[in-house]
Amino acid sequence: MANKKKPSIKKSVNEPNPHLKQSHASGSQQSLGDSLIEYNQPESSIPVCYIQNYPQFSDSYLYEPPFILSKVNEEVGHTVVHFLCTGNYETLRTASEPGASKIGIEFRRSMLVYQAAKEYDLYDLETYAKKYIEVFGESMSIFDIMEAAREIYSKLPKDEIWLTGYIYKQLEIAFSLDRNIFQRVDFYDGVGKDPNFDKDVMRMVVNIYSEVLSRQLDETTPEGSIAEDGAAEDCAAEDGAVEDGVVEEGAVEEGAVEEGAVEDGAVKDGAVEDGAVENGVAEECGAAEDVADDGALKEAVNLGIPSQPSGTALSFEWDHWTSGSKMGASFSGNSQWKYEKDTNSLYPENKAEESGGFNAAYEGIKSKKKKDKKKKKSNKDKKVEELAEPVPECGR
């Protein structure tokens, strides 16, 4: 369907085509065939009653036709419109890009849907997008996550905080698995494309390093202080013993004056013994300090970095479903996808070289862990509550 051009609205070359179109009749007079939103991927429209379920598409917008959804990327235009009609999340089958994994494509789409949902205050769609970002992000490297996030980061509202927190969490996880992750060449791919994104990521990296250093100080300082305090008390006790020896030595000297030179020899021997005691005290104090220093060194070396986890095989299953939208045919039926966490690869059961997409409310998606031959863990189905209430049908 060709869109009508209007002089007051400018469109860029790659701008998506979805737009709102005003109907001359009121909502109660319009039939199901009348449309307020149209888009051409594929050619279809949205009945009026569905639009009326969303307050953000108020009359103030409808009286200024056409309302162009310019913030919706054309790759997820179908997903947004399908959500408006059914309340569910759906992506279409498309040819895979060379070198791109199937699950990587769906992760990027989830990012694009999140950006569109934030722009037009579609809370339920935003909830879907967040969940799929987290699900598909489990198999993505930090480099792929940053690449997808960089594409939408500066397009989000200024008060957006969820994606920033998600990126920070993924950076922390990546650093805990590899202390040299921030020094790798791949980490700096794409730097300069979005200065705002680069600045925030740099701030996150500095915060992560600062937290690690602070944690080291908190863990090492109290133990070192306790060791030093204990050694100081021991030294003080020994000093007290020496002082007592000095007092006794004074008494011996007085006795030596009265009794004779023989006792002077005894006093001298006592003085030698006192010197030996003092040397022993010094050696004990030095040993205590060495033990404290060794403990601090071991604590400083140990950053508490966990070992790299072994690869985990997960499977996603979509049960039978049919498209409830009026958008035309889309990918449907039985499909089972499997990806390996270590290889970031997604394998559709039909082995087709395309991204199959999926259609289901989130409750229909199950995540399973396969049995491990060594550990023999039992399979557990993930039960996830429904994220969005179904949109009521027209006329009800």
UniProtKB/Swiss-Prot annotation:
The keyword Transmembrane does not apply. Keywords: Cell adhesion, Virulence. Residues 23-32 have a biased composition (Polar residues). The keyword Ubl conjugation does not apply. Residues 367-380 have a biased composition (Basic residues). It comes from the Eukaryota. Induction: Expression is regulated by the hypoxia responsive morphology factor A (hrmA). GO terms for biological process: cell adhesion. Signal peptide: none annotated. Residues 1-32, 347-396 are annotated as: Disordered. Part of the subtelomeric hrmA-associated cluster (HAC) containing genes that alter the hyphal surface (such as reduced total chitin or increased beta-glucan exposure) and perturb inter-hyphal interactions within the developing biofilms, resulting in a loss of vertically aligned polarized growing filaments. Consequently, this hypoxia-typic morphotype (called H-MORPH) with altered biofilm architecture leads to increased hypoxia fitness, increased host inflammation, rapid disease progression, and mortality in a murine model of invasive aspergillosis. This is Subtelomeric hrmA-associated cluster protein AFUA_5G14930. The lineage of its organism: Eukaryota, Fungi, Dikarya, Ascomycota, Pezizomycotina.
